[in-house]
């Protein structure tokens, strides 16, 4: 069976390292699907869910808050400042953080504050969407 080695790494730790049949993740220009022997690629990724179909057929979900993707024919590396295993996502915390970001956006006084609040809001909305997607797959 053909597999590809996948590493998902955050600033704090390695979130996933193992063999997979397929990886799907949110590329900057749209969803990316990666199989073994994929053409080499380096691109930025958007906040969202990384879905890894492991060699044994089970699936692993990881939320990433954006980052970089490197693909080689036999290796996929996802680098993200923030990456959270699907099972560790907390909807209450994400919803509260989204509400704080919405409030910060309303109270923003300059372009930098607006951009920071919009970025945080996008990440929290993506995290909530990833959590709901993870729950549907369970």
Curated annotation (Swiss-Prot):
Domain of life according to the entry: Bacteria
Protein name: ATP synthase epsilon chain
Record's keyword terms, sorted: ATP synthesis, Cell inner membrane, Cell membrane, CF(1), Hydrogen ion transport, Ion transport, Membrane, Transport
Localisation per UniProt entry: Cell inner membrane
Function: Produces ATP from ADP in the presence of a proton gradient across the membrane.
Membrane topology designation: Peripheral membrane protein
Family: Belongs to the ATPase epsilon chain family.
Main subcellular location: membrane
Transport is among the record's keywords: yes
Source organism of this protein record: Polaromonas naphthalenivorans (strain CJ2)
An example molecular function term from Gene Ontology annotations: ATP binding
